[in-house]
UniProtKB/Swiss-Prot annotation:
Gene Ontology terms, MF aspect: metal ion binding; threonine-type endopeptidase activity
Biological processes per GO annotation: proteolysis involved in protein catabolic process
NCBIfam families (alphabetical): ATP_dep_HslV, PRK05456.1
Regulation of its activity: Allosterically activated by HslU binding.
HAMAP family in the cross-refs: HslV (MF_00248)
Name of the protein described by the UniProt record: ATP-dependent protease subunit HslV
Subunit structure comment from the entry: A double ring-shaped homohexamer of HslV is capped on each side by a ring-shaped HslU homohexamer. The assembly of the HslU/HslV complex is dependent on binding of ATP.
Protein localization: Cytoplasm
Active site: 10
Organism: Rickettsia typhi (strain ATCC VR-144 / Wilmington)
Length: 182
C-alpha cells in the first residue's frame, strides 16, 4: 500500500478504569481520500474472549498479524506479554513481516500493549492506548475524561472519546464497535 493516509486511516482506543478494560474501533475503511466501507470490524477476540486485538493500517496486513499473534498466544499458553514480544521479534526479523503496514493494540486483564511495525511492544503508563489517524484525538479526550469525569464508566469514556475523534478525524467515523475484556 503506497498511500500513507490509508495506512493510518482509523481510530482504535483501549482503556482501563476500575478493572474494566474496553477496546473501541471506528468502522471506516479508507483508501487515500475515499471511504470504501463504513461498517468494518477492526476488533477481534482470541483465547476464549480473554484477549482483544484492534488493528490500524492495511486490513490484509492487520489480519495477517492477527493470525500470527493468535499462533503465538496458543504457543505461549495465552501469555499475552510473552506472545507480543515474540511476535515483535518475528515482525522485526522476518523479511515478509517487515513489509506489513499495520499497528495493533492488544489487551487482556493484565496488559494493554501497542505493537508497532518497527517491532516495538509498548505498554502505556496511564492505562490508555490509541492508534491510527484519530488516535491522538481519542487519547487526548480519554485522558481528559479519565481525569475530570470520575462518574463515567470505562465504556462511556471510550464512546465519548471515540466520538470526539470521529468529529475531528476525516478518516474515522461514528460507527463505533466496543469489546470488553473478560
Amino acid at each position: 500500500m503506497s498511500d500513507n493516509l490509508a495506512l493510518h486511516g482509523t481510530t482504535i482506543l483501549c482503556l482501563k478504569k476500575n478493572e474494566e478494560i474496553i477496546i473501541a474501533a471506528d468502522g471506516q475503511v479508507s483508501h487515500g481520500n475515499t471511504v470504501l466501507k463504513s461498517t468494518a470490524r477492526k476488533l477481534r477476540t482470541i483465547a476464549n474472549n480473554k484477549i482483544i486485538v484492534g488493528f490500524a493500517g492495511s486490513t490484509a496486513d492487520g489480519l495477517a498479524l492477527f493470525e500470527k499473534l493468535e499462533i503465538k498466544i496458543e504457543q505461549y499458553n495465552s501469555n499475552l506479554l510473552r506472545s507480543a514480544v515474540e511476535l515483535a521479534k518475528d515482525w522485526r526479523n522476518d523479511k515478509y513481516l517487515r513489509r506489513l503496514e499495520a499497528m495493533m493494540i492488544v489487551a487482556d486483564r493484565s496488559h494493554i500493549l501497542i505493537l508497532t511495525g518497527n517491532g516495538d511492544v509498548i505498554e502505556p503508563e496511564n492505562n490508555i492506548a490509541a492508534i491510527g489517524s484519530g488516535g491522538l484525538f481519542a487519547l487526548s479526550a480519554a485522558r481528559a475524561l479519565m481525569s475530570y469525569e470520575n462518574n463515567l464508566t470505562a465504556e462511556e469514556i471510550a464512546l465519548k472519546s471515540m466520538n470526539i475523534a470521529a468529529d475531528l478525524c476525516v478518516f474515522s467515523n461514528h460507527n463505533i464497535i466496543m469489546e470488553k475484556v473478560v
